[in-house]
Amino acid sequence: MGHPRKARKKYDTPPHPWNAERIKEENRLVAKYGLKNKKEVWKAETMVRRYRRDARYLLGMASEHTGKEREQLLGHLVRTGILNEGAKLEDVLDLTVEDVLRRRLQTLVHKRGLARTVKEARQMVIHGHIALDGRKIDAPGYIVKRGEEDKIGFYPSSPMKKQIEAAQDAE
């Protein structure tokens, strides 16, 4: 038993530290999504691994209770935007790390055009310039739900928002 105040690790480290192919892939993901370190890649990998493990378990079982669990797992993945509407449990087995990394607040800020680069998006989130439905969120790894996606914007009192509005007015 662990200590109740100490949360368990949210990621698993790779089984072998010096695998060139894995390191190359992790470096590509770190560069593409502007991650701080490989731990963020490992967190996403662990999330995908747990979703796929649960899906394999549920596909192998057939009972009334597992039917509810299937709905819950699919509902969670659809709400978070990792899977599309109408997805089946078999689709969970096809999930990749990039499916999870695309749902991060940092990535969506860049995709919506609020930042020029993913690194700038990360900095804007950390410095408190980004709000989600009016609430300041300073965690770039926050998984944005499907309903919150269009509510991403600048924090109302952000000096960054004022600078961008001034630049747009000057044009």
Swiss-Prot record:
State any single GO MF term. rRNA binding
Which biological processes are named by the entry's GO terms?
ribosomal small subunit biogenesis; translation
Keyword RNA-binding set for record: yes
Entry-linked SMART domains:
Ribosomal_S4, S4
Which UniProt keywords are listed? Ribonucleoprotein, Ribosomal protein, RNA-binding, rRNA-binding
Secretion signal, residue range per the UniProt entry: none
Which Pfam families does the protein's record reference? Ribosomal_S4, S4
GO CC annotations, alphabetized:
small ribosomal subunit
Superkingdom:
Archaea
| Residue ranges annotated for the S4 RNA-binding domain, each copy included | 103-167
**InterPro entries per UniProt:** Ribosomal_uS4 (IPR022801), Ribosomal_uS4_arc (IPR022802), Ribosomal_uS4_CS (IPR018079), Ribosomal_uS4_euk/arc (IPR005710), Ribosomal_uS4_N (IPR001912), S4_RNA-bd (IPR002942), S4_RNA-bd_sf (IPR036986)
The protein's job, in short, is: One of the primary rRNA binding proteins, it binds directly to 16S rRNA where it nucleates assembly of the body of the 30S subunit.
Record text on subunit structure and interactions: Part of the 30S ribosomal subunit. Contacts protein S5. The interaction surface between S4 and S5 is involved in control of translational fidelity.
**Matches recorded under PANTHER family:** 30S 40S RIBOSOMAL PROTEIN, 40S RIBOSOMAL PROTEIN S9
Family recorded in the similarity comment: Belongs to the universal ribosomal protein uS4 family.
Protein name (database record): Small ribosomal subunit protein uS4
Q: Which organism is it from?
A: Methanothermobacter thermautotrophicus (strain ATCC 29096 / DSM 1053 / JCM 10044 / NBRC 100330 / Delta H)
